Amino acid sequence: MSKKSKGKILRVIGPVVDVQFEEGDLPDIYDALVVINPQTGKKLVLEVEQLIGDNAVRTVALDTTDGLMRGLEVENTGEPIKVPVGKGALGRMFNVIGEPIDGKEDEIKDVEYWPIHKAPPSITEQSTSVEILETGIKVIDLLAPFPKGGKIGFFGGAGVGKTVLVMELIRNIAIEHHGFSMFAGVGERTREGNELYLDMQEAEVLDNTVLVFGQMNEPPGARFRVALTALTMAEYFRDVEGRDVLLFIDNIFRFVQAGSEVSALLGRMPSAVGYQPTLATDMGELQERITSTKKGSITSVQAIYVPADDITDPAPATTFTHLDATVVLSRRRAALGLYPAVDPLDSTSKMLDPNIIGQEHYEVARGVQEILQRYKDLQDIIAILGMEELSEEDKLIVQRARKIERFLSQPVHVAEKFSNIPGKYVPINETIRGFKEILEGKYDDLPEMAFYMVGTIDEAVEKAKQLQKK
């Protein structure tokens, strides 16, 4: 920890500020410096990123630098950015430096202050036990089950439903599991953050959640560090309270994007596709801290925007290596109205192993994937020659596959006001039973529309009766 000292602003280049100190007073890397912005009268936090010689440091501002000028006095706090952690933070909304931004007058009580930069837990502290986290979303629980204390990526281009799925998971964890969730809004739309806050207030799940935002309009420094702020809050509940916590990051691509902006401003030579040369290190520093220890776990769900739907782009490709499960959202399924638009063939999980999930679940999941793959292979023949040219066996496969595709959809609670269909939470054993019975041919006589946007298989049977009456 460096000593407290004072310096002066030397240069301001957008969000990058150079500060000069007296001989022997240099701050450490990642120390927080504070300057009062004369234009707003508010304190602005700068984080030290580089030592540039001549007793000067290069810092990144965590808020706008409009109004700063050369010669302004800067104070070194002598420690990294510290944010409030603990029960008192639940139900509140913060910015990157841990200041409440929800407009509430109440003071934050019952909290400690932890630095956002920490070493990950050592190998001896980490836990390796394997357990499934039930989400209540059929397509995920069946084909890409989430490991408790693992990392899950939601891959998808713009507008395929990543944020809606993240919001549904927060709701399900809070209401069905009574768990705590931390949400980091990284470089996404402020409007979406506002909607999330209001929806959570309405669903009465806000008291179990902490929201931390560094949105699109904020400088790259704030967007680059906001995920660490939320992670630090999650670490408190894991390490001190011994809880299983969920950490939602929307969107991890914006974290990489902000890192790329910061890197360029700090004068580093860009690497592949213009990304920062430190891409793997930046990602590793964040991801290695998201883990299970012997005290508790952090399960992380990360929405990952795929630029131009190119999965080989360095940002999504670097994220892939850290994940235990990948949920790929498909534009084709979204276009067909099959929500959640999860691609059942591209989505994978390391948990899909008979030794972990049991033989029955494994066989049903593989049976569903097999029949959907066969249907995909037959689609070219159907497009050219029509259904009539198929063998009876293939016709049956197509019929069952179309029912399975529709049964993989389900109404979500957070979209009730748009769809007017009440949301459904489906327990994992009901999910397995439903798909097993479809594969066995028990419902070959029911119309495929009966399986669309329902919860359990019993609801599909009931819907079929309603359709027959019409």
UniProtKB/Swiss-Prot annotation:
Binding site for ATP: 156-163
Keyword Lipid metabolism among UniProt keywords: no
Membrane topology: Peripheral membrane protein
Pfam families cross-referenced by the UniProt entry: ATP-synt_ab (PF00006), ATP-synt_ab_N (PF02874), ATP-synt_VA_C (PF22919)
Transmembrane segments: none
Catalytic activity: ATP + H2O + 4 H(+)(in) = ADP + phosphate + 5 H(+)(out)
Subunit structure of this chain's protein: F-type ATPases have 2 components, CF(1) - the catalytic core - and CF(0) - the membrane proton channel. CF(1) has five subunits: alpha(3), beta(3), gamma(1), delta(1), epsilon(1). CF(0) has three main subunits: a(1), b(2) and c(9-12). The alpha and beta chains form an alternating ring which encloses part of the gamma chain. CF(1) is attached to CF(0) by a central stalk formed by the gamma and epsilon chains, while a peripheral stalk is formed by the delta and b chains.
PROSITE patterns: ATPASE_ALPHA_BETA
Protein name, as recorded: ATP synthase subunit beta
Keywords, in A-Z order: ATP synthesis, ATP-binding, Cell inner membrane, Cell membrane, CF(1), Hydrogen ion transport, Ion transport, Membrane, Nucleotide-binding, Translocase, Transport
Entry-linked CDD domains: ATP-synt_F1_beta_C (cd18110), ATP-synt_F1_beta_N (cd18115), F1-ATPase_beta_CD (cd01133)
Function as written in the Swiss-Prot or TrEMBL entry: Produces ATP from ADP in the presence of a proton gradient across the membrane. The catalytic sites are hosted primarily by the beta subunits.
Family: Belongs to the ATPase alpha/beta chains family.
Subcellular location, record wording: Cell inner membrane
Entry-linked InterPro entries: AAA+_ATPase (IPR003593), ATP-synt_VA_C (IPR055190), ATP_synth_F1_bsu (IPR005722), ATPase_a/bsu_AS (IPR020003), ATPase_alpha/beta_chains (IPR050053), ATPase_F1/V1/A1_a/bsu_N (IPR004100), ATPase_F1/V1/A1_a/bsu_N_sf (IPR036121), ATPase_F1/V1/A1_a/bsu_nucl-bd (IPR000194)
Main location: membrane
Signal peptide: none
Assigned EC number: 7.1.2.2
Molecular function (Gene Ontology), one example: ATP binding
Protein's organism: Thermosipho africanus (strain TCF52B)
GO cellular component: plasma membrane; proton-transporting ATP synthase complex
Domain of life of the source: Bacteria
